[in-house]
């Protein structure tokens, strides 16, 4: 079990880290309480937990293999969320990645190597997730603070 102090800053970032306690635990499919690593992840957990159209959800349940063009390596990444949503008379599975909007667009400053690398790695991950989700008949969405706040 990971020892996490809610509201504390993450080891590798300035993000708040904490344990999310679902209000509707029957909807959460994890074996342990989910640990959010950012405010956006916490907001997404709250949205999935409280939305009546969401039947079930899980946090970081699926490893996806992708080719990291920035570092020329095959890597794995865990999709942030998988949700099953009611859509009329049927259900659909949605893979969700949560990112700050600034990381979903090419950097404005072409000389910002860190931002350019982050964007390139993210697009590699998202292309792999999109392809795999589509092959399984699922949807893939990237949510930012604009959709979650």
Where are these regions (language model features)?
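Electrostatic, structured charged patches in enzyme active sites and in nucleic-acid/phosphate-binding
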Residues: 1-149
């Amino acid at each position: 079990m990971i020892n996490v102090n809610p509201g504390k800053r993450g080891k590798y970032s300035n993000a708040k880290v904490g344990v999310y306690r679902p209000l509707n635990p029957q909807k959460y499919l994890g074996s342990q309480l989910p640990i959010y690593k950012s405010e956006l992840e916490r907001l997404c957990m709250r949205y999935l937990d409280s939305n009546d159209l969401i039947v079930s959800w899980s946090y970081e349940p699926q490893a996806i293999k992708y080719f990291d063009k920035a570092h020329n390596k095959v890597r794995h990444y865990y999709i942030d969320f998988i949700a099953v949503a009611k859509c009329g008379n049927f259900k659909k599975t949605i893979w969700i990645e949560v990112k700050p909007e600034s990381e979903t667009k090419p950097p404005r400053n072409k000389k910002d190597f860190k931002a350019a690398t982050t964007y390139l790695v993210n697009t590699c991950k998202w292309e792999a997730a999109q392809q795999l989700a589509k092959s399984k008949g699922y949807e893939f969405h990237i949510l930012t603070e604009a959709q979650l706040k």
